[in-house]
């Protein structure tokens, strides 16, 4: 099961969100191609938004949002519209998660990136541009906001914004289920199907 289960099974304790108001951030901007050789999900966080976070000498750019306190430990990213466009590389959500980001808030996403987020334990919330402005204005005060997945709402100060989410995707996040865990939930049916297949089509199982 995925490591984010505990966090999303309860109301998130809260995080000061990092606001990155750039539209059309593609997956190559999230994690450049030179870091895609690995098939491990760990170790990519240090290269998240590499070309925006570091100069040509590899030094951190001090005024980039994720290089400034308190955003160096941000769990929530508020992003511009069409976030995650471009190629379908799954390394993009891997890099976000390895950095520590478990929730992205935007007005729109590329479809493949959006679905890859759920598969990797990141909650991508879609709300309107006006609502984005509300939250970003609040976040500029360096105040924490909370994500309440059970009740599907973003809580900031005395305000809250409701968001929509597919029930099945919500279940997977709440229960920490990835593709393997979902398959294991149906292990009895899988075994039963294989036994039936062995009796009706035994040649499939011949060495």
Regions found by a protein language model. Name each.
Residues 1-207:
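Fe-S-dependent hydro-lyases/dehydratases of central metabolism
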